Amino acid sequence: MFLKKRSSSGILGTLSLTGVVISSMVGGGIFSLPQNMAASASAGAIIIAWLLSGIGIFFIANTFKTLSLVRPDLKAGIYTYSREGFGPYVGFTIAWGYWLCQIFGNVGYAVITMDALNYFFPPYFEGGNTLPAILLGSILIWVFNSIVLRGIRQAAFMNVIGVIFTLIPLLIFILITALFFKFSIFKTDFWGTAPQHHLGSIGSQLKSTMLVTLWAFIGIEGAVVMSGRASNPSSVGKATILGFSGCLLIYVLLSLLPFGSLSQYQLAKIADPSTAGVLKFLVGKWGEVLMNTGLLIAVLTSWLSWTILTAEIPYAAAKNGTFPECFAIENAKHSPAFSLFITSGLMQITMLLVYFSSNAWHTMLEITSVMVLPAYLTSSLFLVKLSLSKKYPKQAPIKARVAIFTGILGTLYSLWLIYAGGLQHLFMVAVLLALGIPFYIDSGIRHDQEKTFLNRKEVMKMTTLALIALLAVFLFSANKIHL
């Protein structure tokens, strides 16, 4: 039974929020890091790539931490920061884009889960888009829906357990590769300049490797999205930094330790999940089984985490009238019931489409991954704007000048991420974001009787996005740009 009542707050502590952050970032891709990083880069270039990405993402993470401390009144921060800083339409667009991004992302987890199952039950789930894969994936969509409906606290607890079981095989991998590590192998062709396997300039190596590192941190905003349910505002910032630090350390070790046992050329040839191939080379079949099992647990855990986050955004947006009011409906367990059902329903439809067009699906997944980046940019810009205004609290635990520095660097790195996403994907993002305009207008008509949501500034923002979307449609239809 659905109940319209205020959400219970203060149910998630630092541990649960950290679990959400880690599971949001650590998906199935982490089990393929050794090969993905070594595919076109040397150990030296990989070290530089993680250093640059780590510094950049640190300022994104610190932006979220600072805002959670300075403006604890803004719940579901990644959406409310945008609304507070740049108006209702920008807030809606960020929420809309983030929601679409995670709907498609969750179906991506379903496809990856089925593909991982194929290792144990070939060939029934091969590629993740066979009929058995679609059926089982559909069942799991509604299983996760049921878990979250039983309460956010319970779902978050299960998520923490999943994170623990995900980290165990990764830590075993790190331990084994450390034991087999030989510095003489690691330093061989450290910069990838050997004539027989020349990888190009350090710059070109960095570019290819950075594209992998960029996506490794998507999900760092997990604690911020759940800030409305945090037991203490400070827990949000702590969880974000803890999750970021832990994941960065794991990413670096997973990427570099295999270079102490295998050459770059050997690592680049290992099939995904490459952690399984590395352990099979080092310790035999049991290592391969262990890592494939870990992959399955990791993907299921991330899927649960993103189910929680995906339903939370439209729920939070509906509470202040940005999304239709029905999305704010809760059940007796204080879960966003209506939002969950609509989200799961859209995931189900998308899952069925995967059966008919797997190639189109992979393209859509790349596009929607870019859709989360405007949220990082607007959050960083809001911190800069807040720090320069008189509204910045004088007694804030973080000084304004430090906040300005953090916000500026977070903004610059966000712009780099958007640039790295590619122009063709950005144009498609504009089209998908523009599809939300009718829903924004409808929601505004229902909640804003004075029609302030259609003032000149908001209309200009909508018009600009609509024109960019129309330009994108023209360029795609004229084959001027391609996905």
UniProtKB/Swiss-Prot annotation:
BP term (GO), one: amino acid transport
Superkingdom field: Bacteria
Keywords tagged on the record: Amino-acid transport, Antiport, Cell inner membrane, Cell membrane, Membrane, Transmembrane, Transmembrane helix, Transport, Virulence
Cellular compartments annotated: Cell inner membrane
Major site of localization recorded for this protein: membrane
InterPro entries noted in UniProt: AA/rel_permease1, Amino_acid_antiprt, APC_superfamily
GO molecular function terms noted in the UniProt entry: antiporter activity
Keyword Amino-acid biosynthesis: no
Gene Ontology CC annotation, any one: plasma membrane
Protein's UniProt keywords contain Hydrolase: no
Family classification: Belongs to the amino acid-polyamine-organocation (APC) superfamily. Basic amino acid/polyamine antiporter (APA) (TC 2.A.3.2) family.
UniProt-recorded name of the protein: Arginine/agmatine antiporter
Gene from which this protein is expressed: aaxC
